[in-house]
Amino acid sequence: MLAALAAASEPPAHVARWRAQVDWEAAQAETVALLSAYLQVDTRNPPGMEEVGASFLGARLDAEGIPWALLPHSEGRASLVARLNATNPTAGPLCLVSHLDVVGWEDERWPADRGPLSGAIVEGSIWGRGALDMKGMGALELQTMILLKRLQVPLSRDVVLLALADEEVANVGAREAVDRYWDQIGCSHAINEGGLGVKDAIFDGESVHGVSVAEKGILWVELIATGRAGHGSTPYPGEAPDRLRDAMVAIDRMRARPVFDETMLDLLDAIGRTHGGATGAVLRSPFLVRTLARKKLMNEPATRAILTDTIHLTGVYGAVAPNVVPSEARAMYDCRLRPGTTPGAMLERLREATAHVDGVRFEVISAAESSASPTDDPLFRALVRYAVEGRPAAAAGPLLSVGYTDSMDLRRKGVRAYGYVPFEVTAEDAETMHGHGERVPVSEVGSGLERLFSVVVDVAAAP
């Protein structure tokens, strides 16, 4: 309901006033060129070496007279912070967050004329690793800072640009920003990655924009089985591979219970209002969602992952040769935990499920609890409003992200962090994140810039 009310509300007058002063065609062209060049900077992680990416952004900031600083954490690796100051601040600083690093790739899987470091503009899209995750957002945020500075928009709160290192591997950049450099950041609110707009997400001709207000916790574990070693020609009881198999079967039989919380129900309500009719009425009714729509939602992998704690087998290890029985065999699990489930509670469930199998134990690789920010906040309402402004076939609402981002560390400081990349793309384009042929439509660079600029002016500019 909150999302629907936010989407229906009119933008403040000062937003329209400042938007009218922007040449949006020129701003899109400038941002497209910026993103194309940014994608050509190699910051794949590992090894990272994000300082070259930070310096690239810093050169653009220098050209506009916006002060910035490196936040180093190891040789060749650094984050960047820049700031536009409010004259008489009436609210805490707003932070525009992105990460400098990108995941690796397989060169042979990309088209020859639009490779991962090309920044090529082909078939109406900008191609390159990071176009969606998340150099595209970084380019929008930098261009928003540039527009604020050029137009001399009077600010009611500081606006901070924070481009972080090492999001894709260990989140060291975010942790160090919070633990070592917070005096240079000190924000109360943040816009980061998380949700985005997807065309035809549920119904043909209708798009859904999820604004992430929470992220699932994690428990990464290894299941380790030990037992008798020997020759493959003669099976014996108590061998490690057999014990591992039995424990894995027990884990596979664990049943997840769906949770229809306020976040999911509010998003479904927004989708239902947009779609209308009998189906829309079902989506707007919590009772009908739990009864009539439950089966369909649980059968879709994407919504099932939101509704439940997930236990995902991601690897099995131990074999030496076909005729050798190893004394140890391992399986790796990625567990993603809804708010309300702690890593300790999930670990206990795993132990209980496998208690009947001798010679098995769990080792924790990494663990973190879920984190969340409230929907009753002006920044969340602004993100929802401009995601769908002027487009009756678009719905926006809160989202529980199944992955985790640097927002998890920001929330440790009490920051209200929301995840929304203001692009609207096809499901096919969205699936290129971390995949082959990552790209973003040129038109969405312009639309996304206007959405983000509108949000920032709404919540950070003096009326």
Task: Identify what each model region corresponds to.
Residues 1-8:
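Hydrophobic h-region of N-terminal signal peptides that target proteins for export
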Residues 9, 77, 91, 114, ...:
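Short, solvent-exposed loop/turn segments at the edges of secondary structure
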Residues 10-131, 148-157:
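Acidic/His- and Gly-rich active-site-bordering loop/insert found
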Residues 44-46, 75, 88-89, 100-104, ...:
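Solvent-exposed loop/turn segments at secondary-structure junctions
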Residues 89-91, 105, 198-199, 257-320, ...:
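An extended, acidic, His-containing surface patch that forms the Zn2+-binding/catalytic region
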Residues 125-126, 132-210:
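Acidic/histidine-rich catalytic neighborhood of metal-dependent amide-processing enzymes
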Residues 176, 180, 228, 233-257:
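A short core secondary-structure module
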